[in-house]
Amino acid sequence: MSSQLAPIPILNQNASEERGEIARLSSFVGAIAITDLVKTTLGPKGMDKILISASNPNELIITNDGATILTKIYIDNPAAKILVDISRTQDDEVGDGTTSVCVLAGELLREGERLVQQKVHPQTIISGWRLALETARAALQSSTQDHSSDKVKFREDLLNIARTTLSSKILHTEKDHFANMVVDAVLRLNGNTNLDNIHIIKKSGGSLRESYLDEGFILEKKIGVGCPKRLENPKILIANTAMDTDKIKIFGGKVVVDSMTELAKMEDAEKEKMLNKCKKIVDHGINCFVNRQLVYNLPEQYFAEHGVMSIEHADFDGIERLALVTGAEIVSTFDHPELVKIGTCKLIEEVMIGEDKVIRFSGIPSGEACTIVLRGATSHILEEAERSIHDALCVLAVTVAETRTVLGAGCSEMIMSKAVDELAAITPGKKAMAIESFAKALRQIPTIIANNAGYDSSELVSQLKAAHHQGDKKAGLNMRDGCIGNAEELGVIESFKVKQQVLVSAHEAAEMIMRVDDILRAAPRQRSNLQH
């Protein structure tokens, strides 16, 4: 009789399992592959990616935004999906650092894989990383600056943060122009971090330089035929209602009539209902009617005769924003005018942007609403420009709420790396190896930035490391000249909250993947045909 029983299968035949080192290696390989995919987009001289839809080859995206790249590609590896999730979370939380968080997590796992091969237990690595994280976070906090009490200096900080964010985007050639634009837009919010008050519209034609900030709300629709094209101090009613009351047409019914006279009576009755609804709307005392749905010729004519500006087919996002900035409410019934909140502004007028007519609402009551009008040669340029502007707006909104800033250009990473190295020097045992690996992963950020710019990264990073160990806490990478410079003088400033979020999220993702020692792929549940 055999002294050892054969393993008993407990999984369904369609399920699969990876255990121990194989599972861990699979996780490492997937995460590192994702890191290698996006790391070439990092930094002011990062490269772009072209994403082509599998279902529609004509649909393509040109971008270097980490979150956009990762969310648009199909990924099967579970560890890689975790990095995609943290990149998406980074984008939702602070708007920037989506590539950095993925790269840092991947570099931590690359170092972790090397330690595992040297027989360092994953729990030892995790313990060392936790100690390193606390030290790095403390070093980052000690390097912060806060100029919120000085409006001039704080605005300059915001401009530098915007320039830093835009320097790696398609807008880098006009980063000063766009930095001023987004800073003005965010400061108009007066401390409010709700970016719904800032509307972005894209109009093909012209160049990126021709983009501008309009101090009002622009709706990409046309005013009804025969209606007033300009109104001062208007009363605005915003609705989401069907102007057609023809229930036969709406519900697809059929009616049999004996004569054309009866058919004419039915049409007259429907027109009467429609005009009654128009009368109720006009009785609100308004002179501007904005509807999400269609306004037919008959109601449009009625509104024109009564001096009411009618705007139809306003998209839902547009009327939500318009209601927010004008102080109105979106209504669908008109029986109780006294309960309806009417919006207002100083001026409504039809203006031209390029070859298109749009409607501008100026003198918004809150004074916060504004519109960024983007111009560009192609739709691909405009889409990428919008993503870049969105990232910059999010970072600035975060900075207005959390006013502390840190230096960029690899300076913050080197400050944290130096502190972590000092911790490793006084830590006994294999845990010191894990702490050292954390410092190496942090140094990979400036290394990759230098590599992407075409410089000798080994030389530059060693010079940067030496400068910090000699006490120069403001030393950073000068990517314009390929040398070491003063990050503060270079104006490379980043939000403390963004940098801290990158550090914490990357560590959490790397630790989660490091803990994995088993990957189970369950079989799909079989659905049997039930007979009744």
From Swiss-Prot:
It is found in: Cytoplasm. It comes from Dictyostelium discoideum. InterPro entries: Chap_CCT_beta (IPR012716), Chaperone_TCP-1 (IPR017998), Chaperonin_TCP-1_CS (IPR002194), Cpn60/GroEL/TCP-1 (IPR002423), GroEL-like_apical_dom_sf (IPR027409), GROEL-like_equatorial_sf (IPR027413), TCP-1-like_intermed_sf (IPR027410), TCP-1_chaperonin (IPR053374). This is T-complex protein 1 subunit beta. GO terms for cellular component: chaperonin-containing T-complex; phagocytic vesicle. Coiled coil: none annotated. It comes from the Eukaryota. The keyword ATP-binding applies. Belongs to the TCP-1 chaperonin family. It holds the Pfam family Cpn60_TCP1. Molecular chaperone; assists the folding of proteins upon ATP hydrolysis. Known to play a role, in vitro, in the folding of actin and tubulin. Keywords: ATP-binding, Chaperone, Cytoplasm, Nucleotide-binding. GO terms for molecular function: ATP binding; ATP hydrolysis activity; ATP-dependent protein folding chaperone; unfolded protein binding. Heterooligomeric complex of about 850 to 900 kDa that forms two stacked rings, 12 to 16 nm in diameter. PANTHER family: CHAPERONIN. One of its GO terms (biological process) is protein folding.
